[in-house]
């Protein structure tokens, strides 16, 4: 198979074999050209390390296939690679597992099996498979991030944080590692620590590229949770500068403006743009309905809020919002029913207390009381 075909089909091992052969023949420069042609400016860590060794004039040993058993392992791995997305994941997993059993140091086969196990919900097996990648291997960082993700999916949140903290301590100059560590802290509601870690990752970036929007977006969310709205707004705006039109940013910034009662025309336009990009995302539809609601356009808010409720039927916030909308258009019995439903979905304590007040007093009285409290707090 020509290397171009190998790259197209994801058979990285075929490319690696040709690179090693060229190196053994004293054609290291040709091997570098091959890597650059197939991987451009973004080779994976392993291929980047090989390219660096070639640049230094080092000869790369041929170790893709050393024995007949290695050859069988390559055959099963190649079959697994070709089956990805073409058949059920169990059959692909079977071939990847056979390859890694025949050759336990076949890291690509081990990683493929681990990721398939995670996809199939076999998290304990996935964690064990990721753990087989030895420290020092070019894929080790990727394996630990995968292991932490599987631990997260298995509900082992503390284990995920520990794995990524250890990895970040050893790779303090790796933006991807710091980003993953920040994510694990954020999921544990450790927003202060997550904000600091995201900041470390951002500080390492010499030239921002569009993909960096995610770091600013996530840090913005953490800052907002900490009550630092100016910092959050700045991060959301920076994220939007890097990725104009990204619906998640448009929705988050737009909804935040709506919730704060600020920049409402601009907020509505942002959310409408997000809805146009993701018309079946319940949380974005909810934002649109809430933007109409906060602008007093209660009748306009009914249809999108009902759609959001259909898309997210057990979300306490969406259900609470639906109750508010129904109340404002005179459908008060339906509003009370939705508030009771919202309470059954276990909202946060503060939200639950406010919903109960609406059931006890009605939304009009709750809003009036909140307005008086705000005016009193402002010295009005």
What does each model-identified segment do?
Residues 4-8, 60-75, 206-209, 213:
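TPR-adjacent "capping" and linker segments in tetratricopeptide-repeat scaffold/adaptor proteins
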Residues 14, 47-48, 75, 109, ...:
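TPR alpha-solenoid repeat register
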Residues 3-7, 40-41, 68, 102, ...:
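Structural marker of alpha-solenoid helical repeat scaffolds
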Residues 23, 84, 118, 152, ...:
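Position-specific recognition of the canonical hydrophobic site in helix A of tetratricopeptide repeat
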Residues 11, 20, 44-45, 72, 81, 106, 115, 149, ...:
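Residue-level recognition of tetratricopeptide repeat
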Residues 17, 50, 78, 112, ...:
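Canonical tetratricopeptide repeat
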């Amino acid at each position: 198979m020509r290397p171009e075909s190998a790259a197209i089909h994801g058979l990285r091992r075929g490319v690696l074999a040709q690179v090693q052969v060229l190196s053994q023949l004293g054609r290291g420069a040709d091997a570098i050209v091959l890597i650059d042609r197939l991987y451009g400016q973004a080779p994976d860590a392993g291929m980047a390390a090989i390219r660096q060794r070639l640049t230094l004039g080092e000869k790369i040993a041929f170790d893709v296939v050393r024995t007949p058993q290695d050859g069988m392992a390559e055959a099963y791995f190649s079959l697994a690679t070709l089956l990805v997305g073409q058949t059920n994941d169990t059959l692909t997993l079977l071939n990847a597992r056979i390859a890694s059993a025949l050759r336990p140091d076949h890291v690509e086969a081990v990683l493929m099996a681990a990721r398939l196990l995670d996809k199939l919900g076999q998290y304990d097996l996935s964690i064990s498979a990721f753990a087989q990648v030895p420290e020092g291997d070019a894929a080790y960082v990727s394996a630990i991030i995968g292991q932490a993700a599987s631990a997260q999916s298995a509900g082992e949140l503390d284990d995920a944080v520990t794995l990524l903290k250890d990895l970040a301590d050893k790779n303090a100059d790796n933006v991807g590692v710091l980003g993953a560590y920040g994510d694990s802290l954020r999921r544990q509601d450790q927003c202060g620590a997550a904000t600091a870690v995201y900041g470390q990752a951002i500080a390492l970036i010499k030239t921002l590229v569009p993909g960096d929007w995610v770091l600013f977006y996530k840090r913005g969310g953490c800052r907002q949770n900490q009550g630092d709205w100016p910092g959050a707004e700045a991060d959301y705006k920076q994220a939007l500068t890097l990725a104009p039109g990204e619906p998640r940013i448009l929705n988050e910034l737009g909804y935040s403006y709506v919730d704060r009662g600020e920049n409402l025309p601009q907020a509505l336009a942002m959310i409408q743009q997000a809805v146009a990009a993701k018309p079946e995302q319940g949380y974005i539809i909810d934002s649109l309905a809430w933007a109409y609601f906060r602008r007093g356009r209660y009748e306009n808010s009914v249809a999108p809020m009902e759609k959001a409720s259909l898309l997210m039927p057990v979300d306490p916030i969406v259900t609470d919002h639906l109750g508010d909308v129904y109340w404002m258009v005179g459908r008060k019995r339906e509003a009370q029913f939705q508030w009771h439903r919202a309470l059954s979905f276990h909202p946060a304590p503060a939200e639950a207390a406010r919903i109960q007040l609406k059931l006890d007093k009605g939304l009009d009285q709750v809003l009036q009381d909140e307005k008086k409290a705000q005016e009193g707090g402002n010295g009005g």
